[in-house]
Amino acid sequence: LELAQRAEKAALDFDPRIINSEGATVSRAVGGSALVTSGGFRGYGDGSYVSLVVSPLTEEADGKKRRGHHWAARRFLAELDDEVEVGREAARRTLRKLGAKKIESAEMPVVFDPDAGRAILGLVSSCINGGSIWRKSSYLVDRLGTLVSSPLVTIIDDPLINKAPGSRRFDGEGLASRRDVVVERGELKTYLLDSYAGRKLGMPSTASASRGSTG
């Protein structure tokens, strides 16, 4: 509670144009899961997760409210970003929305905020998922070994990064997790497959199974 209060206060104190807040929220979870398969695998994994979200409000000259937010998340509370800086960054992002307006459609250079990376990777992930490939519902069907992006882009699926939120020792089928280069300098190198999708495509699993889905 105190951590959330300090974060919210930092946002409100940052600039007089921050007129209010929709609150600051701290969420924390600790849990574990066991996996036993008919193939003889038995495994157990546990972990924790903590996040902080701050949502300040500002106001246009015409009275229109603008809402912004910033967040931080880590495996462990002791490693969470400083709550005061999270609050201040939330205020900065909120103030950037002042004067925002619609523009006509056009082709132009775009600078992505770092947070946009998560959304972009989510879209890429759905397109390289084995289920999407064998069902032929992805535009990346039959694109292995071809350029699918700028040569400046390299994407790595690495569930072995120490303390990373998505890290795991084994996948949903009990196969040992591994690091895969998905896109290297713009070239599509692999799809992400569980055993079923791998069999459908005649390819080995990349240990990418998640419980309750095929990919």
Describe the role of every protein-language-model region.
Residues 1-50:
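Hydrophobic alpha-helical hairpins/lids featuring a short glycine-rich hinge
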Residues 7, 143-215:
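Dual-mode signal for accessory low-complexity, basic/Gly-rich regions
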Residues 7-15, 38-46, 55-56, 96-101, ...:
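A generic local secondary-structure boundary/capping motif
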Residues 14, 47-124, 128, 132, ...:
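Internal alpha/beta scaffold segment
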Residues 23-31, 104-117, 158, 162:
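A glycine-rich phosphate-binding loop feature that marks nucleotide/adenosyl-phosphate handling sites
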Residues 30-49, 64-72, 120-126, 166-169, ...:
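Short acidic, glycine/serine/threonine-rich loops at helix termini
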Residues 47, 56, 79, 133-137, ...:
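Gly/Ser/Thr-rich active-site loops/lids in small-molecule metabolic enzymes
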Residues 129-149:
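Amphipathic alpha-helical
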